[in-house]
Curated annotation (Swiss-Prot):
Transmembrane segments: none annotated. It comes from Methanosarcina mazei (strain ATCC BAA-159 / DSM 3647 / Goe1 / Go1 / JCM 11833 / OCM 88). The active site is at 82 (proton acceptor). The gene is nadK. It is found in: Cytoplasm. NAD(+) binds at residues 82-83, 87, 150-151, 161, 178, 180, 191-196, 215, 250. This is NAD kinase. Its EC number is 2.7.1.23.
């Protein structure tokens, strides 16, 4: 399964959670005000570690997100939008559970609205369940680059230019494409770029990766859903035509025709605090309406 549920519960009236982390956007006053409100409300109840970037803006001592697990942090409160969540997850090799406060727009990865934040955090401190979502390790010429939570996009390095490439699954040719690019998405990322490119929405309980060509030249190049434990290889075919690989829309790397890109399911899933019993299908419909 690519989505599993775990529980952390309190004993009696005692808080189950003793140490939490906070990491936020730093460029919006309302986001920083929310962080200040959380600190004012809960600093006397639990030990709070604030990310270095957020702490610098607030003028307090900070802790890198990468070190929060070593400090005994049990969950990270991410204040911002989906991009903030993805950046925070990417900083952790083995991600801590994330509780997302939605200060963005659409927000598929952030379930808590600002007006509900304090009450929700208070409930979570007495115990919570979390869901594990699969991620994908990205390798370039055998060297690991990053781990993607949402998607990996391979696109032309020059705007409005198509690229020609092959996609192999476990050494079997899936397709040879001429297109603007291709998106490889996890079930979590199937509602992001992959969906905009015409790919299917995948329930997180489905253990799969979706392959979505972006503006393909031939009509037979269609989206594919493949097993999550597959090894995917991407090879550029045209000499002197470079491409760019973008990971979760956060980091990008230039690739050349002689380069080999491989994608494999990661051993370290993302973990999201569960705060609602709303079913997946209803939740997606609500977000998209």
């Amino acid at each position: 399964m690519c989505m599993r549920r775990f529980y952390i519960c309190s004993q009696g009236d005692n808080l189950a959670i003793k140490r939490i982390g906070i990491a936020s956007r730093c460029d919006r006053p309302e986001v920083l005000d929310m962080v200040r409100e959380i600190l004012a409300r809960f600093s006397s109840q639990v030990q709070i570690f604030v990310s270095t970037a957020t702490a610098e803006v607030l003028g307090i001592e900070g802790t890198p997100v990468e070190r929060m697990r070593d400090e005994g942090v049990e969950l990270v409160i991410s204040v911002g939008g989906d991009g903030t969540v993805l950046r925070n997850i990417a900083k952790m090799k083995d991600p801590l559970p994330i509780l997302g406060i939605n200060m963005g727009t659409l927000g598929f990865l952030v379930d808590v609205e600002p007006e509900d934040a304090i009450e929700t955090i208070e409930e979570v401190l007495y115990g919570f369940s979390y869901l594990e979502r699969m991620r994908v390790d990205v390798f370039l010429n055998g060297e690991m680059l990053e781990t993607a939570t949402n998607e990996i996009a391979v696109m032309s390095a020059k705007p409005a230019k198509i690229i020609q490439f092959e996609v192999h699954v476990n050494d079997c040719l899936l397709d040879e494409m001429r297109a603007d690019g291709v998106v490889f998405a996890t079930p979590t990322g199937s509602t992001a770029y992959a969906m905009s490119a015409g790919g299917p929405i995948i329930n997180p309980r489905v253990n799969a990766i979706v392959v979505v060509p972006v503006a393909p030249f031939k009509l037979s190049s269609r989206p594919w859903v493949i097993p999550a434990d597959s090894e995917i290889t991407v090879k550029l075919l045209e000499h002197k035509k470079d491409a760019v690989i973008a990971i979760d829309g956060q980091k990008s790397y230039r690739i050349r025709p002689e380069d080999i890109v491989k994608l494999k399911k990661s051993k370290f899933p993302a973990r999201f605090v569960r705060i609602s019993d709303t079913c997946f299908y209803e939740r997606v419909q609500r977000k998209l309406s």
